């Protein structure tokens, strides 16, 4: 029943326009940088980005363990591809900075909320795809933290939304890809 309720919320979801993203090139490395202002305090956002039970509800991957401590080794299974990678948390300064795999998360207090910045090292060919996907994941995260979950929208599920295709096109235009 709970999954059905989440899916019904998902049916009424439509992402806003592409925003809060940029690309940085350093040699051969490309980094997608996304900034999102959330209405929730850093401690709450920290739990959502480190706890596997919370990640399951919004992130584009499953984590088999908690990501909240340096040295933690966790397997990530990406929803879009099923690819599994073992990663080690290299930085965990709760509730402000988290680094593992190709991801770096920074949480900054912003009034009663949080400015979330994600750096994602990504293949240049997939930058617009990644930006559209993270955009939707962050929308889902915001609703989850507000107590109005709509269910995970990631991987193939995200691509079914007309909004995902529009976002991907908007980000592709923005990034010239």
Q: How should these model regions be labeled?
A:
Residues 25-34, 40, 44, 52-95, ...:
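Short beta-edge strand/loop motif at the mouth of beta-sheet-based domains
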Residues 83-87, 103, 114:
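Short beta-strand segments
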Residues 49, 59, 145:
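Short, flexible helix/strand-to-coil boundary loops that buttress conserved ligand/catalytic motifs
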């Amino acid at each position: 029943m709970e999954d059905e309720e989440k899916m019904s919320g998902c049916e009424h979801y439509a992402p806003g326009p592409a925003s809060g993203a940029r690309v940085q090139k350093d040699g051969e490395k490309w980094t997608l940088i996304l900034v999102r202002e959330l209405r929730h305090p850093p401690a709450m956002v920290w739990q959502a980005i480190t706890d596997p039970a919370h990640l399951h509800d919004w992130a584009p991957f499953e984590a088999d363990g908690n990501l909240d401590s340096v040295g933690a080794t966790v397997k990530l299974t990406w929803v879009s591809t099923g690819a599994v990678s073992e990663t080690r948390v290299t930085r965990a300064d709760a509730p402000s900075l988290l680094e593992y795999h190709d991801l770096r998360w920074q949480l900054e207090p912003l009034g009663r909320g949080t400015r979330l910045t994600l750096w994602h090292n990504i293949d240049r060919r997939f930058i617009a795809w990644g930006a559209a996907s993270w955009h939707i994941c962050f929308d889902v995260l915001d609703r989850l933290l507000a107590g109005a979950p709509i269910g995970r929208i990631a991987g193939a599920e995200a691509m079914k939304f007309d909004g995902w295709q529009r976002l991907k096109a908007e980000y592709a235009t923005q990034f010239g890809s």
